[in-house]
A protein has these predicted regions:
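Post-transcriptional modification and biogenesis factors for structured RNAs
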Residues: 1, 222, 229, 235
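Single conserved hydrophobic/aromatic residue that forms the stacking wall/gate
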Residues: 1-10
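Charged, compositionally biased non-catalytic regions
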Residues: 14-67, 74
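Long, compositionally biased intrinsically disordered terminal regions
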Residues: 114, 126, 149-215
């Protein structure tokens, strides 16, 4: 079969790289078996979705890619430090290891800025200045900086803006939670305290009640369907 070109090779490398950033325990085995199939079939392995190994790597890739895409829009930077020695600091708590991806994304956009992105779950940070690097961090020190040296003036302005553009009659917390799940909101300034956060928490509680009720109704429907089928068999 003719070669499918560098594009497919690059695509395969991207999928494997993203899969390696997954938090799933089986990622190493999945990548190993995927590569074995790749050496056997070549670039066309990417289209062989009937192979379990190919499907699993694609699932891992898609999970990391989707979470990375969301965090690109949900990362919020705060100004940290004293006058003349300030940096932009963002904190995240992702399921997967996103620092290499997010770091490069924001380095391309804030090339002249000194910034850091901290992954609270892994106690790691991506630091960008004259050079860029990943490093383990002391979370106690990060907490002290976050609480004691964060400039909140712009945060308060953004919270005011967030509330002022809202249209009361069009508020839809179910849709909001779908588009911006609660697990992403820990360090999103528009949800960190104040009226917006209180309303969101109340809405989250109401939504959970609806979900529980829907789940109970679904269980009841399944049981009724099961009894009906059994009755038909007896008849």
């Amino acid at each position: 079969a003719p070669s499918r070109g560098l594009g497919d090779v690059y695509k395969r490398q991207i999928q494997v790289y993203y899969a390696s950033l997954s938090n799933e325990e089986d990622k190493v085995d999945a990548i190993y078996h995927f590569l074995k199939q790749g050496f056997r079939y070549g670039a066309r392995v990417l289209d062989m979705h009937g192979l379990v190994q190919v499907c699993r790597v694609y699932e891992l890739y898609r999970s990391v890619s989707n979470e990375n895409q969301k965090y690109r829009g949900f990362v919020r930077f705060a100004e940290i430090g004293r006058q003349g020695r300030k940096i932009l600091l963002a904190r995240i708590r992702p399921k997967n290891q996103l620092l290499p991806l997010l770091g490069q994304h924001f380095a391309d956009r804030f090339g002249q800025e000194n910034f850091a992105i901290i992954d609270d779950e892994r106690a790691m940070g991506y630091f960008h200045g004259e050079t860029a690097f990943l490093s383990k961090v002391d979370m106690a020190q990060i907490d002290r900086l976050w609480q004691g040296q964060r400039d909140t003036a712009y945060e308060e302005l953004f919270q005011t803006f967030f509330r002022s553009i809202a249209i009361k009659e069009r508020e839809n917390y179910v849709c909001q939670r779908t588009m911006c799940p609660i697990r992403y909101r820990d360090y999103m300034v528009e949800f960190s305290g104040g009226k917006a956060d209180e309303e969101t928490q109340m809405a989250g509680g109401r939504l959970q009640m609806v979900e529980n009720r829907t789940e109970s109704m679904g269980t009841g429907t399944k049981q009724m369907g099961s009894h009906k089928i059994q009755g038909e068999h007896k008849a």
